[in-house]
Structures are given as structure tokens and as C-alpha cells.
Regions:
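Cytoplasmic-side transmembrane-helix entry/capping segments in multi-pass membrane proteins
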Residues: 6-7, 60-68, 116-128, 147-148, ...
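Alpha-helical transmembrane segments of compact multi-pass small-molecule transporters, enriched
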Residues: 16, 39-43, 96-110, 125, ...
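Membrane-interface helix caps and helix-loop-helix hairpins in membrane proteins
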Residues: 82-88, 113, 136-144
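Juxtamembrane C-cap of transmembrane helices in multi-pass membrane transport proteins
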Residues: 15-27, 39, 77-88, 96, ...
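Specific transmembrane alpha-helical segments of multi-pass solute transporters/efflux pumps
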Residues: 16-17, 45-97, 105, 133
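Glycine-/small-residue-enriched transmembrane alpha-helix faces in small-molecule transporters
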Residues: 1-34, 142-167, 185-186
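Residues that define the loop-to-transmembrane-helix transition and helix capping
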Residues: 30-31, 91, 117, 175
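Hydrophobic transmembrane alpha-helices of multi-pass small-molecule transport proteins
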Residues: 44, 116-136, 155
Length: 186
């Protein structure tokens, strides 16, 4: 089941970032995301039912999953899509939000009491370096300030959601957790 869920997650997740810059040319970023997450939540609900996951869970866990969804999908993807609508390129937005693992590791020690190993830091450094090398950026391009701010909000949303989920919603199955997250973002 985890393999199926992984493919489902990759499909839904990657399609948003890739298609976002094109979508906001024809639709409001937030209307597009609302439509997207209504569809995604329906798919995760169906997936959860097929695999007989327990959908009715403790209200507190539902609340925590929904906060994660608002932070992750609302602020993160909302910030990214809004930055596109303000004229920021997907390239620069990706460079900003790919700082998320670095920021998460910096905050996970004090908040989650986790120790980040030197090996993890090296991996994150090379991942960020690889992103810069693969994506690159044209320094001569004019950069819209509002778009940069929206991408920073997206970065903070993804970081907060990652920490929140690790702290509060790690006991929920992935498909049910994603159902409530997508539902709250829609």
C-alpha cells in the first residue's frame, strides 16, 4: 500500500508545482487550488476506503491534520501559486522554497528536540547546491517583490507544516492524514 500511496502522492504533489505557472495565467491562484484540493481530497478519501483505512478518527487528530493542511497546502502552494500570479518565475520560487529542509533542520532541534546529524546537513547542502545548479537563475531578470514575499510565506508555511505534522499528526495513516489535509486546503 505504501508504494501505491507514494506514487499517488508524487503525482498529485509534483503536478501542482509544474502546472502552477500555466494555471495562474487563466485562473485565480486560490480558486485553482480550491478546485485542485477538492479533487485531491476525493481521491484520498476513495483510496482510504479501498484500503479500509479508519477515516473516523479522534477530533483532535483531525484538527491537527487540518492545521497541517492549511499550512502546507494553503500557505505553501497558495504562496507559490500567488507568487506566479505576481510574475515570479517557477525557477526563483523553487529556489526560495527549496530552503525548506534547511529551515526545518534549524528549527527541529529546539522545537522537536531532534538532533540533525552532520550527514543529514551534508545531504541537505548537496541537495540545495544541486537545485541551484539544475535550476539556475538569470540574475538580469527583474524580480517582483510581492512574488518573492509570497514565496517566503510559502517557505514558512511548508516549514511550519512539516514541524507541526511531525509533532502532532504522525499517528494518523498517510492516506487519511492527506485526506484531511487536502479537505482543509480545498
Amino acid at each position: 500500500m505504501n508504494l501505491y500511496l507514494s506514487f499517488l502522492f508524487i503525482f498529485f504533489w509534483s503536478s501542482a508545482f509544474i502546472s502552477g505557472q500555466f494555471i495562474v495565467q487563466s485562473a485565480s491562484p486560490f480558486a485553482a487550488l480550491c478546485f485542485r484540493f477538492c479533487i485531491v481530497s476525493a481521491f484520498f478519501l476513495i483510496f482510504s476506503i479501498i484500503f479500509k483505512e479508519r477515516i473516523r478518527i479522534n477530533r483532535n487528530l483531525i484538527f491537527q491534520a487540518m492545521i497541517t493542511g492549511i499550512l502546507f497546502h494553503g500557505f505553501y502552494l497558495g504562496g507559490v501559486f500567488f507568487s506566479y500570479s505576481m510574475g515570479l518565475t517557477a525557477t526563483l520560487s523553487a529556489l526560495i522554497v527549496c530552503l525548506q529542509p534547511i529551515l526545518t533542520n534549524i528549527l527541529s532541534g529546539p522545537i522537536l528536540k531532534e538532533k540533525v546529524t552532520i550527514t543529514q546537513w551534508i545531504g541537505i547542502f548537496f541537495g540545495f547546491l544541486g537545485t541551484i545548479l539544475v535550476i539556475g537563475y538569470d540574475i538580469g531578470t527583474e524580480i517582483p517583490t510581492i512574488g518573492v514575499i509570497a514565496s517566503i510565506v510559502a517557505l514558512l508555511g511548508a516549514t511550519s507544516a512539516t514541524i507541526w505534522q511531525k509533532k502532532f499528526t504522525h499517528k494518523i495513516s498517510l492516506s487519511v492524514n492527506n485526506f484531511y489535509q487536502a479537505l482543509s486546503a480545498g
